[in-house]
Amino acid sequence: MTNIRKTHPLTKIINNSFIDLPAPSNISAWWNFGSLLGICLIIQILTGLFLAMHYTSDTATAFSSVTHICRDVNYGWIIRYMHANGASMFFICLFLHVGRGLYYGSYMFSETWNIGIILLFAVMATAFMGYVLPWGQMSFWGATVITNLLSAIPYIGTSLVEWIWGGFSVDKATLTRFFAFHFILPFIISALAAVHLLFLHETGSNNPSGIPSDSDKIPFHPYYTIKDILGALFLILTLMLLVLFSPDLLGDPDNYIPANPLNTPPHIKPEWYFLFAYAILRSIPAKLGGVLALVFSILVLAIIPLLHTSKQRSMTFRPLSQCLFWLLVADLLTLTWIGGQPVEHPFITIGQLASILYFMILLVLMPIISIIENNMLKW
C-alpha cells in the first residue's frame, strides 16, 4: 500500500515541499534564513492577532489601548514586546537572507528573486504602518514625514498625500486605514511567500559552490528539518532574551509620549531597520531626488541579475568580489549609523559618500571586478 503522505492531494504538496524534497548536500547555515523568516511571519501573525483583540484604532484611545494591553491584559506585555522585537528579528533575517542571495548568486533564479523583492517591499510597508499604530510621538511624526514624501511626485503629489491621509493631516482616518492595511498585509505576504517557494522548487536550491548539484541530492527530511529546528531555537532564544531583558533596546523613547501634532520631536527617525534607506533619502537635497534614491535603494536589487558579468555564479572562489561584498556590508552599517544621527556637518557628508558608494558598488564596481576576475582566470 502506497504511503498516504505521498498520495493524498493535500499531504502530497507538503511532502514534496518539506519532506521528500531533493536538496543539495552542501548547503550551509546561510540557507536557514528562509525557514526562519517563515517562523518570524507566523510569530508576527499570531502575536498581532492577539494584540488586535485589544487594540483600538482611534486617535483618542490608541495610545491608551496599547498601555492597557501592557498593564491589564494577561501576558499582554510579552505579546506586545514579542511583536515589536519580532519585527526586528524579521528584518535581521531578511537582510541576512538577501545578503546570502547576493553573495552566492541566488539572484540568478530571477522569478524567485523578483518575488523576494516584492516581499521585501511588502514587509517594509507592513512594518512602517505597524509603527504608526501605538500613536506615540515618533508614530505620528514618522507617518507625517514618510507619507509627505509622496507630495514630491509631480502634478498628483499633493492630492495623493491627502487621499492617503483621508484629510489634510495625519489623523483618525489615517490611523484606521493603516490598522486595516497592517492587518491584511501579513496574509498577502504569506501568499507571496508560497509563490516564492513555488518558484524556488521549480529550479531547486542553489548551493555555496554555485555549481549545479543535481548529481548529489539528499532528502530535506531529516537532514534539513533538524538543521532548521536548530536555527529556530537560536532565533527564539535571541528573541526571548531581547523581549525579557531589554524589550525597549531597539525602540525609540519618544514613542512613549502620546502623539502631539503641536510638538515636533528633536530628531524624527524611523525604526533601526529603515535607517540605511532613510540616510540615502536625506543625503540628496532635492525632495524628488531623495524619494527616487530611497525607492531605488531597494529596487536596485531587481537589476542585479542583469549586471552579473562573472563566469562563476557564487563568490566562493572570487576573492576580489568578496572584498567588494564586505565593503558593501560595511557601507550599509555606516548608512544605518548615519540615519540615526542629526542632520549636522560631518554626518551629512559621510551619508552622501556612503550613499554614492552603495550605488557604485552594486551598479559599477561589482560588474567591473567580475570581468577583471574572468580575465585573471583567462575565461
Swiss-Prot record:
GO terms for biological process: mitochondrial electron transport, ubiquinol to cytochrome c. Heme b b562 binds at residues 83, 182. SUPFAM superfamilies: a domain/subunit of cytochrome bc1 complex (Ubiquinol-cytochrome c reductase), Transmembrane di-heme cytochromes. The keyword Cell inner membrane does not apply. Its cofactor is heme b. It is found in: Mitochondrion inner membrane. Gene3D superfamilies: Cytochrome Bc1 Complex, Chain C. A ubiquinone binds at residue 201. GO terms for molecular function: metal ion binding; ubiquinol-cytochrome-c reductase activity. The chain crosses the membrane at residues 33-53, 77-98, 113-133, 178-198, 226-246, 288-308, 320-340, 347-367. GO terms for cellular component: mitochondrial inner membrane; respiratory chain complex III. The keyword Ion transport does not apply. Heme b b566 binds at residues 97, 196. Keywords: Electron transport, Heme, Iron, Membrane, Metal-binding, Mitochondrion, Mitochondrion inner membrane, Respiratory chain, Transmembrane, Transmembrane helix, Transport, Ubiquinone. Binds 2 heme b groups non-covalently. InterPro entries: Cyt_b/b6_C (IPR005798), Cyt_b/b6_C_sf (IPR036150), Cyt_b/b6_N (IPR005797), Cytb/b6-like_sf (IPR027387), Cytochrome_b (IPR030689), Cytochrome_b_C_euk/bac (IPR048260), Cytochrome_b_N_euk/bac (IPR048259), Di-haem_cyt_TM (IPR016174). Belongs to the cytochrome b family. Heme 1 (or BL or b562) is low-potential and absorbs at about 562 nm, and heme 2 (or BH or b566) is high-potential and absorbs at about 566 nm. Component of the ubiquinol-cytochrome c reductase complex (complex III or cytochrome b-c1 complex) that is part of the mitochondrial respiratory chain. The b-c1 complex mediates electron transfer from ubiquinol to cytochrome c. Contributes to the generation of a proton gradient across the mitochondrial membrane that is then used for ATP synthesis. This is Cytochrome b. It comes from Mustela altaica (Mountain weasel). The lineage of its organism: Eukaryota, Metazoa, Chordata, Craniata, Vertebrata.
